[in-house]
Amino acid sequence: MVVKLVNNELKILSGKLRDIFREIYNKIKNDENINDRNLDDKVLSLLKDYTISEENLKIKFSEPKDEIYSYEGRRTPYDLLCYGIINGKNFLIFINNKFGDLKSNTRNDVTTYNNLLRLYLGIKRQRLTSEITINGELVYNRISGNEIVSYGIFVVDKYRRGYKFFLLEEIKDDFYVNPRNNMFQIRYSPNLGDPIDYFAFVKKLIDAILESLEKSLNSIKTEILVLNSIKIQLINIKEGKHGED
C-alpha cells in the first residue's frame, strides 16, 4: 500500500491558482461569445503577461511548450503552461481549459494516458515503446519533491453557472481511462481533497491505465472469438454446410 502524502507546495499553488482563475472567470462570465473554440485563446490573452512575485513564490504563464505537438496546430495535451518557483523549487503546471456542464456526472476527455505519462515522466517520444528509458534523475527529483509537476483543469460552465479549477492530484475519485480511446476521463465536479504527492499520483495513474488495458484486452479476445465463429459459419454457408448438424 502506498502512503499518499500531501504535497504542501502544490497545495499552496492550487490555492493561488484558484484565486487567479476566479479573476479570469469574473472577466469572461458575461461574454456571450465565449465557447469551446475560443476559450483557450481568451484565457491565454488574459494570463500571458500575468505575474505573481512574492517572497518564496513566483508564478508566470505562457502558451504550451511541447517538443512533439505544436500549439498552433491545437494538438498539445494542454492549453496553458503555468511555471515558476516556490520555496526554491521549480514547478510546472499544465493547464487544460474546458467548456462544459459542471452539473453532469458524465466523464469527460482530458487527454490520452500516453500524454499524461509523457508530461509527468519527462518522456520525449510520442508513443510509449519498450525502448523508452525513464530519466531517473528527473523522476527522482520529482519523487523527492525537489521539482514539482502537476496538471490542472479550468472548467467554465457552458450554461453560465460558474466555474471550477482543480489539480488532478486533488481528485479523490478513482481514476478512469476509457479502454476504447485511451482517454483519461474525469467529471467536471469531482470529489476533491489535498493534493497527493508525485509518486502516489503517478502510481494511481498507471494502475488506472493497466486496468483499462486489461479490459480492452479481454474485449479484444472476445471479439476475436466472435469473428472466428462468424468466419467459420461463413465458410460453411459457402460450402453448403449450413443447416447441417
From Swiss-Prot:
Keyword Nuclease in annotation? yes
Could you mention a single GO BP entry for this protein? DNA restriction-modification system
**Record-listed E.C. numbers:** 3.1.21.4
Catalytic reaction(s) noted: Endonucleolytic cleavage of DNA to give specific double-stranded fragments with terminal 5'-phosphates
State what this protein does.
Answer: A P subtype restriction enzyme that recognizes the double-stranded sequence 5'-GTNNAC-3'; the cleavage site is unknown.
Name any one GO molecular function. DNA binding
Q: Does the keyword DNA-binding apply?
A: yes
Q: Which UniProt keywords apply?
A: DNA-binding, Endonuclease, Hydrolase, Nuclease, Restriction system
What's the protein called, per UniProt? Type II restriction enzyme MjaIV
Q: Which residues form a coiled coil?
A: none
